[in-house]
Amino acid sequence: MKRVMADPPAPASGRRSVADMQIEPQKPSVKNPPEQFAGDVWLDVVAAPHTDDQRMTVAIVKFAPGARTAWHSHARGQYLRVTQGVARFGDRAGNIHEVHPGQTIYTPPGEEHFHAASGDTFMEHIAMLEAGDDPATTTTWLEHITDAEFNGTK
């Protein structure tokens, strides 16, 4: 029978190969910056690339009621899976999508959009995206959304 370990010890060489399975170290929650978010929003990184050929980043993002992102886009698109509360996602055409726990919304590469918690409940989603060819261009941040854009009455 194999022994179950919470975190396997490093090999005698002191280094692990990329193929070694490991428990990821827990990272502290980060409050997102006001230049990119309005209201209180926290991010917990779930997974990030280990090697140069990996692109996927996964994070749990928690929004206080009414909190929202600024307009932004992603070089390779983004998947967002709502896990708690009611989310509002909007695009430049004025479309507002209300997304509930268990639903996933996809934003194609380059589409300018925002995500937000509805005005009266906390919202949490899992964000999944791949880095752009130049990681600095993975997300392009733009101006803050207006209340009219948030409400879909622009």
List where the protein language model places each region.
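Short beta-strand His + acidic residue motifs that chelate non-heme Fe in jelly-roll/DSBH
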Residues: 69-71, 89-90, 107, 112-119
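Short hydrophobic/aromatic-rich beta-strand segments that constitute the beta-sheet cores
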Residues: 43-44, 89, 125
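Short acidic-glycine-tyrosine-enriched beta hairpin
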Residues: 93-109
